[in-house]
């Protein structure tokens, strides 16, 4: 899939960050609170990471008052998990326990597709049937990755209250933001031009042609584009929250 960015992706990240701002406000509604913000989508690694990035940019615009317990550290994201990166539950639990002990809360951004191989392996080892759709894909709604993450970490980090929330329905019903409106306009203008010229293809910025906006050949189009976890902005985000540099997951 050579298309640089799908229409609506930036809006979804914006809206996911807005959703998170309300949900993470619950971090001090109880002692030792674990919040799992689940970003819906089978292969939404980029969206999960971009949502965390936009949320943290929003935090940069806030004013804090540590004297009454209003701190950026407590409002921050403490873990980001995507399908393309290896998941070290034990290592992360050890790190997050220290965060919980220090702040009294832990907030995680989890892609719905993260941890699926581990969940499937655990279900099969227990002799359970893994629910799949007609195409053989694991039914994410049935195995509930967000709840699985919460279950994995809750005891290990001694959480006393757990809150799992999905932002997908909120995000995907939103109107396009200005970035996406501009992107849509540029694509529709070119789409009309190419259609009148009888040139077939999918309109998008072609990453393999220097991000040129063009009609990309149909035979080059495919789904399930993996998120590039080696990008500097993503590695910087993880480093900033104290999470280890990502390693590629075996399934990717």
Regions found by a protein language model. Give the residues of each.
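C-terminal non-catalytic interaction/assembly regions of soluble proteins
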Residues: 115-252
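Accessory alpha-helical/coil subdomains and C-terminal extensions
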Residues: 7-160
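Conserved small/polar residues in nucleotide/adenosyl-binding loops
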Residues: 2
């Amino acid at each position: 899939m050579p298309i640089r960015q799908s229409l609506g992706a930036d809006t979804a990240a914006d809206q996911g960050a807005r959703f998170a701002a309300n949900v993470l406000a619950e971090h001090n509604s109880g002692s030792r609170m674990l919040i799992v913000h689940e970003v819906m989508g089978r292969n939404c690694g980029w969206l999960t990471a971009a949502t965390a990035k936009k949320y943290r940019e929003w935090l940069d615009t806030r004013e804090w008052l540590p004297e009454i317990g209003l701190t950026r550290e407590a409002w921050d994201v403490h873990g980001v998990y995507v399908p393309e990166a290896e998941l070290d539950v034990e290592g992360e639990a050890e790190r997050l326990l220290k965060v919980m002990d220090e702040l009294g809360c832990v907030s995680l951004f989890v892609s719905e597709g993260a941890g699926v191989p581990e969940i499937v392996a655990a279900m099969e080892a227990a002799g359970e049937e893994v629910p799949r759709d007609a195409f053989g894909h694991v039914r994410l709604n049935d195995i509930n990755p967000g709840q699985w993450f919460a279950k994995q970490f809750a005891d290990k980090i001694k959480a006393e209250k757990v809150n799992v929330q999905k932002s997908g329905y909120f995000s995907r019903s939103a109107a396009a933001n200005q970035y996406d409106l501009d992107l849509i306009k540029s694509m529709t203008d070119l789409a009309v031009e190419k259609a009148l010229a009888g040139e077939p293809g999918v309109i998008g910025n072609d990453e393999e042609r220097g991000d040129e906006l063009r009609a990309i050949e149909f035979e080059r189009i495919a789904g399930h584009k993996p998120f590039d976890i080696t990008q500097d902005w993503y590695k910087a985000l993880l480093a900033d929250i104290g999470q280890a540099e990502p390693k590629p997951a075996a399934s990717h």
